[in-house]
């Protein structure tokens, strides 16, 4: 339980347990794909996905920074994350770490069954989303939020702020 008795359940697929979970709450915050919520009855929105390749390197640093984006056409990945720099490259005792782990992020086409990451911003998908938004507006108990629920590109700081603001206004 969290503040004001908001129950949080992890590793629970809302859509597989929708009836039981809906019965427990006055409001639902749904951040999954809006088209999935409505069982794709108007059609499937398009998304982009990503895949990751992880590598343990036998050296103390690869890029000296947590995240580096690559925007040139010649580089096949879009980003490299060097995880140790989120903790400033030190262990719990403040010692330098002798190895590093990197993750290369590759953009990939999305197909049903893949993890959707980013909405496809074009006229066709915008029009289909507008129709789903009408259905969503008719669901007063459900707050649709996030990249997938609003079918909108957000940086993570933006989506966290938007969801917190929305919850603040809806739940108080």
Describe the residue ranges of each PLM region.
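Short, small-residue-biased leader/transition segments that mark boundaries at the very start
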Residues: 1-2
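Generic hydrophobic/packing signal
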Residues: 6, 31, 79-81, 159, ...
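General small-molecule cofactor/ligand-binding pocket signal
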Residues: 7-11, 143
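Mid-domain catalytic core of redox enzymes
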Residues: 12-135
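C-terminal catalytic lobe of FAD-dependent flavoproteins
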Residues: 115-172
């Amino acid at each position: 339980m969290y503040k004001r008795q908001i129950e949080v359940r992890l590793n629970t697929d809302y859509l597989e347990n929708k009836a039981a979970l809906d019965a427990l709450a006055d409001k639902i915050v749904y951040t999954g794909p809006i088209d999935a919520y409505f069982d794709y009855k108007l059609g499937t929105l398009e998304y982009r996905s990503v895949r990751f390749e992880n590598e343990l390197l036998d050296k103390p640093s690869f890029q000296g920074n947590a995240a580096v984006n690559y925007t040139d056409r010649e580089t096949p990945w879009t980003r490299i994350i060097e995880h140790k720099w989120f903790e400033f490259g030190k262990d719990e005792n403040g010692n330098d770490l002798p190895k590093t782990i990197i993750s290369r992020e590759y953009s990939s086409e999305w197909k049903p069954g893949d993890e959707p990451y980013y909405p496809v911003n074009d006229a066709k998908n915008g029009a289909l989303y507008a129709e789903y938004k009408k259905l969503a507006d008719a669901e007063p108990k459900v707050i649709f939020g996030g990249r997938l629920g609003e079918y909108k590109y957000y940086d993570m700081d933006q989506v966290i702020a938007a969801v917190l603001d929305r919850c603040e206004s809806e739940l108080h």
